[in-house]
Swiss-Prot record:
The lineage of its organism: Eukaryota, Fungi, Dikarya, Ascomycota, Pezizomycotina. Keywords: Fatty acid biosynthesis, Fatty acid metabolism, Lipid biosynthesis, Lipid metabolism, Multifunctional enzyme, NADP, Oxidoreductase, Phosphopantetheine, Phosphoprotein, Transferase. Pfam families: Fas_alpha_ACP, FAS_I_H, ketoacyl-synt. It comes from Cochliobolus carbonum. This is Fatty acid synthase subunit alpha. GO terms for molecular function: 3-oxoacyl-[acyl-carrier-protein] reductase (NADPH) activity; 3-oxoacyl-[acyl-carrier-protein] synthase activity; fatty acid synthase activity; holo-[acyl-carrier-protein] synthase activity. It catalyses: acetyl-CoA + n malonyl-CoA + 2n NADPH + 4n H(+) = a long-chain-acyl-CoA + n CoA + n CO2 + 2n NADP(+); a fatty acyl-[ACP] + malonyl-[ACP] + H(+) = a 3-oxoacyl-[ACP] + holo-[ACP] + CO2; a (3R)-hydroxyacyl-[ACP] + NADP(+) = a 3-oxoacyl-[ACP] + NADPH + H(+). The gene is TOXH.
């Protein structure tokens, strides 16, 4: 059989393929009964089988011959992974090394056997005379692995340190720093590694001594624990074809390491294992070389090298034969693999060639020529044309604006502010604002106006005109509410605004709101209306007069567009179309506007326009549209008429494309595109609308088309096909009568003159004055828009339905002779004037230099000063006592128990926009200040502070680029880093680099269960893993002994179930991640803490320190000068806590990845508060951990306030922290709670627009990560210490909801915060009068004074009784005078404390929470908590829902109170009422307030300095972290048991 195979292969290679003869030879001449094919599949045997069936089957049956044909699957064993590893390794320099074998010297004679083998494999063989070979280094003497080294390695890996950093003189107990969980984990590993050899209390024995103790009886090899670590390292970090056996073989051949030295080597490799799997041979080689370098350095040895030897003696030849034989076998095996590959390739090529042969030639030619029309089209039309016709219309991206009823409240608030001023500057704004309010007025806004008037009367406005103005607007609103909104043309050049004073405005509003505008001329000048005929433009006096009347009416009475549907194309920034849109919305029109620049910036511009000008009933629909695309034209018309209520009344096709600098000789694809936009597709658009009206039978409502004509009929030149496009539109007027669409469209041509400030005319604005000097009139864009809007709202529109009309707003431009030349002269004059001015300036400069000298000039320029960036904390501005506090003091002084008043003294946050300061900048303005940019750039690691010598050797103190180490001037930071900062902050597309485990929603990992259909190659594993595999898979796994001790070969068989990773795409791709590059290490937090704790704890640590600094605290132990250690509490909460640790505990542990042994503790929600206390405070106070989903922070505030009011604490940290991880994001998405970001993108929304909780289009919330912390203290303590006070927490409450089945459903339980008996709002009753008297602050003050008189009487009586008792004691000889004096002092102290307690209780009962008195609560919590400070519900100036930033213009001190509400999944309704700090200052005297200011000033300066130094030095948090408790260890019990213990001598 072997001979047959060799002959067959020789025959096949020696001659052209003669397979038919070969078959006949095997089946006929040789009569072979068994035919075996060696190859990848049954290729040849199948062919032979068919031949046998056709020619030999009947003969064989007659002769009784039974033939069988065997393919590879019938005779081959399944591929074995270990064998494949050996096969690949044998072809390399050393077994697993990916290097070619050494060259063979041409003088070495190979053996006969070797030559024969080469011939049989088809490998060309030379006849060398001599071989030079690398001799592996000699095997080094084996030494056992020291036990102390194993112990150090185990401890180092648990501590996330290098073993070199572990001193053998230290004990394990000292190294772990008291972390009991970590201690137990290490001890468990020791017992597993050295079973039966671990002494008692090993944690208290130095590592060196521990190693000596456990080395007795140790075999010098790796134990169970370290062997498992080595195996995991190899299986997870080495390439798939590298098992432990191949690694050990490599170490032996490369460096001569014996087994125990290999153990030491591998243990070192475990410690220094790479972060990710090594994928290339070079990376494996480099990794092992690096480990070898360090290993031999530790052993004090040089790295052994293979020696090259030329072998000529017989002895060496014998040694060479073994090496060469191994290589030859590798060559043979490699050749066999190549043969198999070539057979497969050949078969594949045959199939491909056959397929190609069956393909018709004309098909190939057609595919070859398919690109020719495309190339021709691009050549003809050009790239600019191709790019300009790309469709962009998408109905899903529509933006709808219709909430005029909401924006009016902003207008009314602005009206209240403006009407207070008594100057002419506010008059124009006041009139325009009044118009907008009248156009938007509704019942809800009337209530708002009425309330504003009432408040103005109550507050006693200093400006009496203020109330009259508001009253006038209110009375006018009552009239206009029943009328349609109107557009008033206030932009004409023929009208002026006359200020008649507020009195004049008030009286005019009573008569007519628009009498402030007085026309100078009744008729507009030079605006003729007519029609185009064969003889040209013919003026119609009748129509001209009609238009003049309409213009006059638009300026005096106004025009309305209620019920009109309008389509506008070409309403970009500063355009005429945008001005028309503004007027249409003012008049109540429903408008569709298209834009070819559909960005968040554009949509925001239109939203702001609607907010300002949208009137009652008006609607604005914004849609992306490219008028250069026929697809978009069709899509737009079909989209509009899907809703027949939007049948169009007006079409304003003003989209245009500028064509500057294109003459007849250089018309290009841009000119063709412009012609398509301004003519071809404009006509198609009109045709589509006409077609839709016709198909729906709409013949009584023709749409009026305002065609944009131009007086420029080529008179300016160099404008491409612009003039041709405009002139061609005039032909449409003739087609109105000659074609059949006159019932559906009416035409009005508008000759648009020189309009300043538009995009098309921007370059010509500088010569507009010269044009007017030539006798033509130029227009502003608002003025032109006003005239066009008047055309639409006047009587001319009706006339257009009879015949097309043309309105000449050209301003006489076409009458100027030689306009082109005169404009050129004007430009030339401007250039000459500019050059003359430059020459004069240069002459003056030279004269200055000649007088003062060049040196002084350089000095002047070199001393330019730039402001330096100062990173500092922001503090609340303290109010003036006489102006802001004294008016309140009369009623509030000493009215409340300040020990139970809760105030906020500090706060901080870490979130998508950085901290609270940078977030405020971005949410207020959308831009960053230089300080804000520098702070974020530092936070993201883009810059760092440097003090020292710069690259050029000069001393430097300032900012440095973290990457290039280049010095960065302060004034360059904003321009250099702002774009990068904005790109990687805020709500944005998820960045996998900063996600836990590199989560990428584009490739979300999951596992797919698969049942094996065939056996897999074997892989190497430890005996323990092999046993686990057998336990799981049973008879579907085969285990055999491996090539090294303790290793097994495991083969999964067909039928075994495995899980295979897959990556899918998840549609939640946007989140609010913290700024990219944020690192806790930048704040000085040590690697040990970073490795130990969960990220949420790191967030909280940083925020806590910044909150302390915001509170003016530079050392946490300063608290204990004023309070006991049990009076500092922590109520920081979270909805899920350490999500990153939770994921590791479940997923990574399941996948057998390295996980800390104490990971469980980091998943507890209260662990964050515990770490803060252990690292910063050392408090013995309460830790309470609220869990309230989205309402967690308000629940925390509620819990903290309760602790202080109940006197269980005097200082409480409150807030919440959340992380963003893959699993929670997926589950929120599954329950449709978060917005589908892909759907949002389809609707044209950018990431920063996806979180919009107050919008009607809200489609779910957007997840984010970060932390927010507040410091709460009692008001008494804050005033005593001089802490900044940001607000008073007047009331907090949590509310559940009714029966239901939906956990996330928002409830109405917070309404209970307004609970009170119904009759308190009704007619007066005895009960009602009593309840209302409690709300009166003056009445309660009288009651409190009466109670204080009683307490004073109690003190007097108690002192009298004490004197009597002392007298009796003095008569008793059993007591010494010292005893009596001590007794007297104790009793006096008791009387004083009791009086203070009673007075505090009285103030609390009649001040803080008077509204809780009685079994039947008569006053609602909201009403009562405000009344305690002399306020009512109308004093709540700001209401924030779910914590969104609100920008409040003007004087922030005008805000008296605010309400914050939030709702969390699981019926967590919450509300908090906050009050301005000046009300607290009104409860103390002026002297006390001045003392507070002095303390506050010193404290804030110190905190600002600490903050700046922390950023500069990179130790902002680390300087706060404590190593010891605030008291000596031996005094711990005394401090815990004695409530009077305080920290003394604190500096």
């Amino acid at each position: 059989m072997e001979m047959l195979t060799i002959d067959d292969r020789s025959h096949q290679f020696a001659y052209p393929v003669r397979w038919i003869e070969t078959q006949h030879h095997i089946l006929s001449e040789l009569d072979s009964e068994r035919v075996v094919e060696v190859g990848p599949a049954n290729i040849l045997t199948n062919m032979m089988k068919k031949t046998w069936e056709q020619q030999f089957a009947n003969i064989d049956q007659a002769l009784g011959i039974e033939r069988k044909f065997f393919g590879p699957r019938d005779v081959f064993f399944p591929p074995n992974r270990e064998n494949m590893d050996m096969l690949r390794a044998a072809s390399k320099k050393t077994l697993p090394e990916a290097h070619p074998p050494p060259p063979i010297d041409s003088h070495q004679e190979p053996s006969t056997q070797t030559q024969a083998t080469h011939r049989s494999a088809g490998v060309p063989v030379s006849l060398p005379q001599q071989i030079a070979t690398n001799i592996p280094p000699a095997i080094l003497e084996d030494v056992s692995l020291p036990v102390s080294t194993i112990v150090r390695s185990l401890v180092a890996m648990k501590l996330r340190k290098r073993s070199d950093d572990i001193s053998e003189d230290q004990t394990i107990n000292r190294l772990v720093g008291g972390r009991s969980t970590l201690m137990n984990e290490i001890l468990g590993d020791l017992h597993a590694e050295f079973p039966g050899h671990v002494p008692e209390r090993p944690d208290d024995i130095p590592i060196k001594d521990l190693g000596e103790t456990m080395s007795i009886g140790h075999n010098g090899r790796l134990g169970k624990c370290t062997a498992s670590l080595v195996n995991k390292m190899i299986s997870s970090k080495m390439p798939g074809n590298w098992g432990q056996s191949s690694v050990r073989q490599f170490l032996q051949q490369k460096w001569g390491l014996a087994p125990m030295r290999q153990d030491a080597f591998l243990l070192l490799a475990v410690e220094k294992q790479p972060a990710t799997r090594l994928s290339t041979p070079d990376s494996v080689d480099q990794f092992l070389v690096d480990i070898a370098t360090e290993y031999f350095k530790k052993e004090g040895m040089s790295i052994p090298q293979a020696t090259q030897q030329e072998n000529s003696s017989q002895d060496s030849t014998a040694r060479i034969v073994d090496v060469q034989g191994l290589r030859t076998a590798a060559v043979v095996d490699t050749a066999m693999v190549k043969d198999i590959i070539e057979v497969l390739k050949g078969y594949s090529n045959q199939q491909g060639n056959a397929l190609e042969a069956t393909m018709p030639h004309h098909t190939i030619d057609a595919s070859h020529n398919a690109s020719e029309p495309v190339d021709l089209w691009l050549t003809e039309h050009g790239d600019e044309y191709a790019a300009g016709i790309q469709p962009m219309f998408d109905g899903q991206k529509e933006r709808l604006y219709d909430s005029y009823w909401n924006w009016i409240h902003q207008d009314i608030t602005e009206l209240v502010t403006l009407s207070r001023a008594d100057d002419s500057d506010s008059y124009p704004g006041l009139v325009g604002l009044t118009m907008r309010i009248l156009n938007k007025i509704c019942d809800r806004s009337l209530d708002h106006l009425s309330y504003a008037i009432t408040q103005a009367k109550i507050s006693g406005s200093r400006n009496p005109i203020h109330i009259q103005t508001l009253q006038s607007v209110y009375e006018s609103s009552l009239i206009f509410k029943a009328k349609n909104p109107i557009f008033l043309n206030r932009t004409g050049g023929d009208t002026t605004a006359r200020y008649t004073g507020h009195d004049g405005l008030v009286s005019s509003l009573m008569k007519h709101v628009y009498d402030g505008f007085i026309p100078k001329d009744t008729l507009p000048l030079d605006i003729p209306v007519g029609k185009l005929t064969g003889q040209g433009f013919v003026i119609s006096p009748t129509h001209t007069k009609m238009f003049a009347t309409d213009v006059d009416r638009s300026r005096v009475l106004g025009l309305t567009f209620v019920g009109k549907n309008v389509l506008i194309t070409g309403a970009g920034k500063n355009s005429i179309g945008l001005g028309i849109l503004r007027h249409l919305l003012s008049g109540g029109a429903r408008v569709i506007v298209t834009t070819s620049s559909y960005t968040s910036k554009t949509t925001r511009m239109y939203q702001e326009l609607y907010a300002k000008h949208g009137s009652r009933g008006s609607i604005l629909r914004l849609i992306p549209f490219n008028q250069g695309s026929w697809h978009d034209v069709q899509g737009l018309t079909e989209w509009i008429y899907k809703d027949e209520s939007w049948d169009l009344d007006f079409i304003i096709p003003f989209a245009a494309v500028p064509e500057r600098g294109r003459s007849l000789e250089n018309l290009d694809s841009g000119s063709e595109l412009a012609h398509r936009v301004m003519l071809t597709n404009l006509l198609r658009l009109l045709g589509g609308i006409s077609r839709n009206k016709r198909s729906r039978g709409i013949v009584t409502r023709p749409a009026t088309v305002l065609l944009p004509f131009s007086p420029n009929h080529g008179i300016l030149g160099n404008d491409g096909l612009y003039s041709e496009s405009k002139v061609s539109l005039e032909i449409l007027l003739n087609k109105w009568a000659s074609e059949s669409w006159a019932d559906f469209l009416s035409l009005m041509g508008v000759i648009i003159g020189w309009t300043r400030g538009t995009g098309l005319m921007a370059e010509n604005d500088e010569i507009a004055d010269a044009v007017e000097k030539l006798g033509a009139k130029t227009f502003s864009s608002d003025e032109m828009a006003g005239y066009i809007a008047t055309l639409m709202g006047g009587t001319i529109t009706t006339e257009c339905q009879k015949e097309p009309l043309v309105v000449d707003l050209g301003g006489g431009l076409s009458r100027i002779q030689n306009l082109k030349g005169q404009l050129a002269d004007a430009r030339k004059a401007l250039r000459e004037s500019a050059e003359l001015q430059r020459a004069v300036a240069e002459a003056n400069l030279r004269q200055s230099i000649s007088i003062s000298g060049e040196t002084s000039r350089k000095t002047s320029s070199s001393t330019t000063l730039h402001p330096r960036i100062s990173l500092k904390l922001s503090w609340p501005q303290l109010p003036d006592y006489n102006q802001d506090i004294s008016p309140l003091s009369d009623s509030l002084l000493d009215m409340l128990d300040l020990s139970r008043v809760v105030v906020i003294t500090g706060f901080s946050e870490l979130g998508p926009h950085g901290n609270s300061r940078t977030r405020w900048e971005l949410e207020r303005n959308g831009t960053l200040s230089p300080e804000g940019c520098a702070e974020l750039a530092w936070m993201m690691g883009l810059i760092q502070h440097h003090s020292g010598i710069s690259k050029d050797g000069s001393p430097f103190s300032g900012w440095m680029d973290s990457t290039t180490k280049e010095l960065v001037e302060d004034f360059d930071i904003l321009s250099r880093y702002e774009s990068r900062v904005l790109k990687h902050t805020g709500i944005r597309k998820i960045e996998p680099d900063i996600c836990d485990s590199g989560y990428d929603p584009e490739r979300k990992e999951s596992l797919q269960e698969i049942v094996l259909q065939r056996d897999l190659p074997a892989f190497e594993s430890t005996a323990e893993v092999a046993d686990d595999m057998m336990r799981k898979h049973g008879d579907r796994v085969a285990v055999t002994n491996g090539t090294s001790d303790g290793m097994r070969l495991v083969q999964l068989k067909a039928g075994a179930v495995i899980w295979v990773p897959r990556a899918s795409r998840f549609n939640r791709t946007v989140a609010g991640q913290i700024p990219s590059g944020w690192s806790a290490k930048r704040y000085g937090i040590s690697d040990e803490i970073i490795e130990q704790v969960d990220p949420v704890t790191l967030f909280s640590l940083v925020c806590t320190v910044e909150a302390l600094l915001s509170s003016g605290i530079t050392d946490p132990y300063e608290w204990y000068q004023h309070i006991h250690i049990s009076e500092l509490g922590n109520c920081i909460g979270s909805s899920m806590g350490g999500l990153s640790s939770l994921k590791k505990m479940h997923r990574d542990r399941y996948l057998d990845r390295p996980v800390k042994g104490d990971i469980l503790q980091e998943t507890f929600i209260n662990t964050t508060a515990a770490w803060i206390n252990m690292l910063l405070f050392s408090s013995a106070g309460p830790i309470k951990t609220p869990v309230g989903a989205c309402a967690t922070s308000l629940e925390s505030l509620d819990t903290g306030r309760d602790l202080i009011v109940a006197k269980k604490a005097k200082i409480v940290l409150v807030g919440g922290v959340e992380d963003f991880v893959e699993d929670v994001s997926y589950e929120f998405g599954s329950m449709k709670a978060t917005c589908d970001t892909e759907a949002e993108i389809r609707h044209g929304r950018s990431p920063d627009e996806m979180s919009r909780p107050m919008a009607s289009s809200r489609a779910g919330f957007v997840e984010a990560q970060g932390c927010g912390i507040q410091v709460l203290t009692s008001a008494e303590l804050a005033l005593k210490m001089g802490l900044p006070i940001y607000g008073i927490v007047a009331y907090t409450n949590m509310s559940a909801d009714k029966i239901g089945r939906s956990v996330p459903a928002a409830g109405r339980g917070v309404l209970t915060n307004a609970r009170e008996p119904a009759h308190i709002r009704g007619p007066e009753t005895t009960y009602n009068v009593l309840s209302r008297s409690l709300l009166n602050l003056t009445h309660r003050r009288q009651m409190l004074q009466e109670r204080r008189s009683q307490i004073s009487a109690f003190v007097t009586d108690s002192n009298r009784l004490l004197d009597e008792e002392i007298a009796n004691l003095e008569q008793n000889s059993d007591f010494t005078q010292e005893d009596i004096t001590r007794f007297r002092l104790q009793q006096l102290r008791f009387i004083h404390e009791e009086a203070s307690r009673q007075e505090a209780d009285a103030a609390f009962a009649l001040g803080n929470e008077f509204w809780k008195s009685g079994s039947n609560q008569a006053v609602s919590p909201i009403r009562g908590s405000l009344a305690a400070w002399g306020l009512d519900v109308d004093d709540i100036c700001v209401a924030s829902l779910h914590g969104k930033t609100l920008q409040v213009e003007g004087d922030h001190s005008c805000i008296k109170a605010c309400s914050v509400t939030s709702f969390g999944f699981g019926q967590k309704g919450s509300q908090a009422i906050l009050i301005h700090p000046r009300y607290l200052f009104a409860t103390i005297s002026k002297t006390q307030y001045e003392e507070y200011i002095a303390k506050n000033s010193i404290r804030l300066k110190r905190a600002s300095q600490t903050y700046s130094e922390g950023i500069i030095n990179g130790d902002l948090v680390s300087k706060f972290i404590k190593e010891h408790q605030p008291y000596p260890a031996q005094d711990e019990e005394a401090w815990l048991l004695n409530p009077a213990m305080r920290l003394k001598n604190f500096s």
